[in-house]
Amino acid sequence: DVCDSLVDGRCIHNGCFCERDAPNGNCCDTDGCTARWWCPGTKWD
C-alpha cells in the first residue's frame, strides 16, 4: 500500500504523525492535526 510518510524508516498509513508539543509542526495530513489523527491511531509497517 501507499505510504503517507516515513518516520525512522517506517511507514505511516493514517496520514498524520504528530507530537503533543508541536501538533501542527510535523503533521503529514494537509488539514493539520486534529484529535482524531493523534498518534495512537498511527499504523506502522
From Swiss-Prot:
It comes from the Eukaryota. One of its GO terms (cellular component) is extracellular region. This is Mu-conotoxin-like Cal 12.1.2a. The cysteine framework is XII (C-C-C-C-CC-C-C). Disulfide bonds join 3-16, 11-28, 18-33, 27-39. Mu-conotoxins block voltage-gated sodium channels. This toxin reversibly blocks voltage-gated sodium channel in cephalopods, with no alteration in the voltage dependence of sodium conductance or on the kinetics of inactivation. Its main location: secreted. The modification 4-hydroxyproline is found at residues 23, 40. The modification 6'-bromotryptophan is found at residues 37-38, 44. It is found in: Secreted.
